[in-house]
């Protein structure tokens, strides 16, 4: 499929890391700490920071998702519509694993059996099912959400938020969401949002109201629901004292950016995709473990689901 809205282009693009605690760093750490590597003296495992431990945990989950998706894609009884979805999940998970820095390998090569080692990388059983894939994606989105809310680094926060969005959307492709998430306004608990994010939500509100007025069901109902959701965020943000500079947020596209797609649908994709990018930025700017951070992560997932419902593609995340 074609590339979807490039969330990376708004601040998510990050330099590729070497493998977590890679050989050079591990050897340096071992030497600097004076750990004994001599005969009869098994070395201790190098210690990892909390940030590296979190990344490693997510990398292991990405590896498990890739493994599970690979089994499902190749299984003989897999539904013809599910197999390509599973293959797409596998390819994306492989890229996510690389972005996360890979799974930590403590030693450069085979070492004596007396040396401690890290836990093996998890992998799927040979009879893994579609439900197993849905479970690994659901678990992954929960892990990534918690990591995003608690991350100390702005860069990590944005990466983990994008990962939360990606795994949530992929889970929805396999098993459609049975119930809506807690609304952003409830999670925010009266916290303010940035001017840019407020403007993005207000642009979405206006666009959805216009689209609803010009459309017939079921598109009218979808647009009206989206307008209500965006309005609730705008009203709550203004009530909380967020700076309000919304002039110029209402420009409609003169034509569709995608062939065979109406200008209205293209507009809907545009405004909700812009909110995904703005929420990811907001998450990085908010303090760790606060309602504002949690609300931004929640808002990113919700906006991505709304954009996807209009046909936007986020397969390139993170």
PLM region descriptions:
Residues 1-9:
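N-terminal secretory signal peptides that target proteins for export/translocation
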